[in-house]
């Protein structure tokens, strides 16, 4: 099970970002397995929008980069090439301009980037944890 797998790795992780239809259930399963509630962030619409905006700002400022890969096969490269900003009320989130495209890889790295920023804000010196898991 995913909750078991993540709970075992919690000691090396600063944040677990969960999103999607089962996010709240996964959060409960993780806390039931001893992962502190502050370590699990459920990406509601506000968190999702913040993640998309933070990632775009990171790319534009040069803080975010992606190693060169075979861009015909790299799912993140494909998602970035097809990325569009879709309106979500007064904000926006990622969408795909390709008929069969998917924005999911871009959403995942956006959430990971925000999770890493959140971890830095909390001054990780006390724990030394460096990873952020996105599910």
What is the predicted role of each segment?
Residues 51-61:
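Short, surface-exposed amphipathic charged segments that create phosphate/polyanion-binding patches used
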Residues 1-42, 49, 53, 67-135:
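RNase H-like, metal-dependent nuclease domains and their acidic two-metal-ion catalytic environment used
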């Amino acid at each position: 099970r995913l909750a078991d797998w993540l709970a075992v790795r919690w000691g090396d992780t600063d944040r677990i970002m969960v999103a999607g239809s089962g996010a709240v259930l996964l959060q409960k399963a993780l806390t039931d397995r001893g992962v502190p509630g502050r370590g699990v962030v459920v990406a509601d619409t506000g968190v999702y929008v913040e993640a998309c905006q933070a990632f775009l700002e990171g790319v534009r400022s040069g803080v975010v980069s992606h190693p060169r890969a075979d861009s015909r096969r790299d799912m993140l490269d494909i998602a970035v090439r097809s990325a569009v900003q879709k309106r979500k009320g007064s904000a926006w989130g990622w969408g795909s301009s390709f008929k069969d495209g998917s924005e999911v890889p871009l959403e995942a790295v956006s959430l990971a980037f925000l999770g890493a920023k959140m971890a830095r804000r909390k001054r990780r010196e006390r724990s030394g944890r460096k990873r952020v898991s996105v599910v």
